[in-house]
Amino acid sequence: MKLLILDAGHCLSLALAREANRRSDVELIIEPRLALTPERLDEVRPDALVIPPLSRPLTADPASVTAHAEAVMACMAACRSRDVPLTWCVSDQLYEDGFESPIDEHVIPEPRDEGLRRLVAAGDRIRAELPRHLIVRLGPLFALEGGHAWLGELLDTLVAGDDLRAESDVIFCPTSADAVAMALIGMLQQQHCGAEAWGSYHLAGTEPVSAYTFVSMVRTQLATRLEGRGETVALGGVKALSHHHDQPLRRVLNCRRVLNVFGVHQKPWRLEVGRMLDAWCLARDDDPAASKEVDQA
């Protein structure tokens, strides 16, 4: 199976490359930008196109959101002209106001934000005009490296001694980019073998948690590992924000369909964070300049 991936520097693109390198049944062609022409599809002849998500579109620059939506539409038109399946990953933030109960796939987002509405309109057109598509809605992605690598950004900020601020009243399911990459390749392999299970799916980590609790847990686990290594680092703190005073905003995706159709189980975000922190610590061993003052006491 040959996949064409856009936006080479995105954390999900890097995760897909790592996953493909562990397998012998997947070939990846990765484009540097979020741009595609029908002629490029003719050259590569992929079995599917994969577009990584625009992370945190609610706080992104409006021009970036518009550009992403327009690029997705151009990709959809190219795929339609060459009958190439399209997989587009989108942020759970499209469900701007959340829901009290877990959100099923058939619930189409109806945001008030103009930028989010552009992304929803792109999804509507894909569903209407390109039968062979996967729209995969993701919880907040985290990874150690690449664009939108939330966990890497948190670690850099904490180690620099700067404080982090996170909402204590926004509940979601953090999602490992590595877990998404493994799931996407498995899903597309089944489609390539004739599953024909096109449509919208939800993919997120297990255990809903507030942004504040997630960031606090990352800080605690980081401090524990650094102490175990004998390193003294004055980590930045974590401060709680509260924007939804009446009740927490819950943005929790119901992921049963991806399990029932493709057999994809959600990975616990705590285990994924722990694994990535272990990898981050090993990388420090290979980079002496990254090590901080060691407590000699």
Show which residues each predicted segment covers.
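N-terminal Rossmann NAD(P)H-binding glycine-rich loop of SDR-like oxidoreductase domains
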Residues: 1-24
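SDR active-site strand-loop-helix element
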Residues: 6, 52, 86-92, 136-138
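NAD(P)H-binding glycine-rich loop region in Rossmannoid oxidoreductase-like domains
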Residues: 31-73, 78-80
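Conserved Rossmann-fold NAD(P)-dependent oxidoreductase catalytic core, especially the SDR/UDP-sugar
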Residues: 48, 73-112
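Short-chain dehydrogenase/reductase
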Residues: 65-66, 101-123, 148, 174-175, ...
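NAD(P)-dependent short-chain dehydrogenase/reductase
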Residues: 127-172, 179, 185-186
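Mid/C-terminal beta-alpha module of Rossmann-like enzyme folds, strongest
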Residues: 183, 190-244, 284-290, 295
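Amphipathic terminal alpha-helices
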Residues: 267-297
